[in-house]
């Protein structure tokens, strides 16, 4: 991919690396991630900044969703450890889907806090 190509599998919000999963239009274009699609456009920059700050977690979510090979999942677990967030490791009792949803919820909550924080500035 060169500088003029756009990865249409990613969210349309500038700089967002999350997977695009929902469309803002009935025409099927303007695809966004699950966080940007629900947000006011005025909040998109704060959301994208927070998702970029948590890039290791965004990558984990993308790997789980893609059912990445074990080699990649080892890297995901290592990055979670490096971020000192062992609470986000997969629990023995949860399926990959449950883990995925839990990590997405962490991202959504963190973005909501970032929006509130920006509104207080």
Regions found by a protein language model. Give the residues of each.
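Intrinsically disordered, low-complexity regulatory regions of eukaryotic proteins
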Residues: 1-121
């Amino acid at each position: 991919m060169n500088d003029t190509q756009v990865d249409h599998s990613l969210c349309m919000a500038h700089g967002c690396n999350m997977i695009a999963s929902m469309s803002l239009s009935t025409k099927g274009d303007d695809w966004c991630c699950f966080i940007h699609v629900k947000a006011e456009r005025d909040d998109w920059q704060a959301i994208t900044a927070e998702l970029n700050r948590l890039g290791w977690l965004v990558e984990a979510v993308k790997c789980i969703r893609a059912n990445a090979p074990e080699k990649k999942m080892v890297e995901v677990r290592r990055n979670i450890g490096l971020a000192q967030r062992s609470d986000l490791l997969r629990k023995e009792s949860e399926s990959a889907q449950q883990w995925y949803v839990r990590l997405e919820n962490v991202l959504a909550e963190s973005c909501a806090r970032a929006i509130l924080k920006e509104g207080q500035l």
